[in-house]
């Protein structure tokens, strides 16, 4: 067992340039890229479906798509999920009777990483922001500190908002949602 581990490490070290070229080739191969694209398109569909269901039912929803800035400090204080993204799971998490429905869901590296995440509130609730609910203020707060894309469904109106870099776009529709998700994921 120890000898085989040494051999694997030796092969990786000796053939590092060749292995790197193979990985680059695979990354540029249209078939391999197509396989990843199909998987990612499915994830876009799952997220979109869950948003539409929660909008229809007027269930509050807060989905964070983690960017380059890590959210480890938030995930540590939340419920770890580590599950494949599915509409059924997202809808069940945001069901008002679910113990996980309060807080945000963080999607990271194509998995639902955590739920019941408490996000920082925006520190400047002035003007129009004074009329926002806690979910929207939390989305703004996180977007002011990180590069995450956050999607919020209002439980009062069923309206979908997209928040990024401290800017909130309210009333986005299914087409706009798919476009943003495609740019993020695919």
List the predicted regions and their residue ranges:
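Divalent-cation
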Residues: 10, 15-18, 22, 26-186
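Membrane-water interface of transmembrane alpha-helices in multipass transporters/channels
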Residues: 1-6
């Amino acid at each position: 067992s120890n000898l085989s581990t040494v051999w694997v490490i030796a092969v990786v070290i000796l053939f590092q340039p060749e292995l790197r070229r193979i990985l680059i080739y695979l990354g540029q191969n249209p078939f391999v890229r197509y396989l990843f694209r199909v998987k990612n398109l499915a994830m876009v569909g799952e997220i979109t479906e869950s948003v539409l269901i929660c909008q229809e039912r007027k269930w509050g929803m807060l989905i964070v798509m983690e960017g380059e800035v890590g959210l480890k400090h938030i995930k540590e204080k939340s419920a770890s999920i580590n599950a494949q993204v599915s509409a059924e799971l997202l809808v069940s998490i945001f069901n008002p009777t679910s113990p996980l429905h309060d807080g945000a869901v963080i999607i990271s590296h194509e998995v639902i990483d955590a739920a019941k995440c408490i996000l920082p509130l925006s520190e400047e609730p002035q003007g129009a922001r004074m009329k926002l609910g806690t979910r929207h203020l939390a989305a703004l707060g996180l977007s002011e500190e990180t590069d995450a894309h956050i999607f919020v469904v209002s439980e009062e109106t069923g309206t979908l908002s997209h928040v990024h870099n401290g800017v909130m776009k309210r009333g986005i529709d299914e087409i706009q949602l798919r476009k943003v998700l495609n740019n993020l994921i695919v």
